[in-house]
Amino acid sequence: MAQSKLDEVVSLAKRRGFVFPAGEIYGGTRSAWDYGPLGVALKDNIKREWWRSMVVTRPDVVGVDTSIILPPEVWVASGHVSVFNDPLVECLNCHKRNRADKLEESYAEKHGDKMPENGMKDIVCPNCGIRGQWTEPRDFNMMLRTHLGPVEDENSLHYLRPETAQGIFVDFKNVMTSSRSRPPFGIANMGKSFRNEITPGNFIFRTREFEQMEMEFFVTPGTDEEWHQYWIDARTRWYIDLGVKPENLRHYEHPKEKLSHYSKRTVDIEYKFGFQGSDWGELEGIANRTDYDLSAHSKHSGEDLSYFNQATGEKYVPYVIEPAAGLTRSLMCFLVDAYDVDEAPNTKGGVDKRTVLRLDPRLAPVKAAVLPLSKKPELQTVAQNLADDLRFNEWMIDYDESGAIGRRYRRQDEIGTPLCITVDFDTLEDHAVTIRERDTMAQERVALDKVADYVAARIGEKRTRVPLKPVEMGGEPWPESGVQEAGGLY
């Protein structure tokens, strides 16, 4: 049976050191993963691009790094202790537990968005294949608990944060005062979160330990809907700008009856991963959280988290627009979208299949590979010096002198390296090298003293300016994205 594209990407990721099972020599832990040399570099590049987009290039967003362990009262105030639950059902045949809502969503996707007429009685267990043999749903709280200090009792009970957002809300007043920020403005946060997922899986898509890239944007009530649409547009363009094909993205509007307890409206950016049973998976949610969080924390803490506009004399609790992205889900999306198989000429005059990751150069873990044509010392010296010179620009550079040059090209293609630089015997005479481009396989001769400039011009450090506010507030319109929603083009 032929492997799916997703299976091939997972195999490549494990084989080439993007992702390893955590604790593999001890049998591993279900859906826990370590990121190898290439994986951690790709993660860092994604985080860097997100931070540049959300903080560095904007005058209205600042950053924080909040604690994983917060006072338990934070989670009481936010509603997580009482409502951060999923409905859990158990198959009476195989005793496998699943989220009832996810089973219903998978059923609807297979049956043209039609929900099961008889509820869970129509749904087949994905583990054993038996239909309709389920227990009644029971709520399951997803927060992971821990205890601080030497005594484990109710007084020492704490939680590992299930989201980074609450750290932003409780720091709202400190950040606003210290940074002299005023609405509309945002606070961005990246870091680890933890959820006791009932059914983790689909490689790194759903795990109990994961990284988030979240931003809370505080606005004047009454302007929230315009800002919400602005951030839906902005976040969608971010994925497209980094190479994701628009036809593989869509927007999912949460039905009103399924909105989270804090949300006025939520739109997910989904990617077509090709999962078994459900093609689409959420990359990022953009929610209009209204004034729920700041009001809740004001009430429970006794601290006034409102904003007073001295110019107008108006005092209000800001509304919040939240773009919340999953880092590891974004990484998985970029890998799947970049994965391709085409043909390349071989030394025998024929063609071979080649695997290539067409990653945007800004995301590629390795920016260029330096390849001496042979292991002759005179070529090795030139190649090693060139690699060291390029690393001085803070680029990750690979040096590979093992195997035929075609095989070395293939090794770099399948990890997404944009450029391969070959040092050959002519280099000793003309002081030039051959640079091969990953996607087209076109080759160009470049003088040694021009190589750094050549690489810099091709790894995409230049960026396009983007609108900084909604059209209704004088901003430029976003270009048509081509991303689908239910009912047509977005």
From Swiss-Prot:
Xref: Pfam families: HGTP_anticodon, tRNA-synt_2b
Coiled coil: none
Swiss-Prot/TrEMBL keywords: Aminoacyl-tRNA synthetase, ATP-binding, Cytoplasm, Ligase, Nucleotide-binding, Protein biosynthesis
Catalytic activity reported: tRNA(Gly) + glycine + ATP = glycyl-tRNA(Gly) + AMP + diphosphate
Region (Disordered): 470-490
The keyword Ligase is assigned to this record: yes
Residues binding ATP: 195-197, 205-210, 282-283, 326-329
Any single biological process term in GO: glycyl-tRNA aminoacylation
GO cellular component, as recorded: cytoplasm
Enzyme Commission code: 6.1.1.14
KW Nucleus (keyword) present: no
Location of the protein in the cell: Cytoplasm
GO MF annotation: an example: protein dimerization activity
Signal peptide residues on this chain, from the entry's feature table: none
Primary localisation category: cytoplasm
Binding site for substrate: 99, 163, 210-214, 322-326
Complex and partners: Homodimer.
Function: Catalyzes the attachment of glycine to tRNA(Gly).
Family label: Belongs to the class-II aminoacyl-tRNA synthetase family.
PANTHER family: DNA POLYMERASE SUBUNIT GAMMA-2, MITOCHONDRIAL (PTHR10745:SF8), GLYCYL-TRNA SYNTHETASE/DNA POLYMERASE SUBUNIT GAMMA-2 (PTHR10745)
Listed name of the protein: Glycine--tRNA ligase
Annotated source species: Bifidobacterium longum (strain NCC 2705)
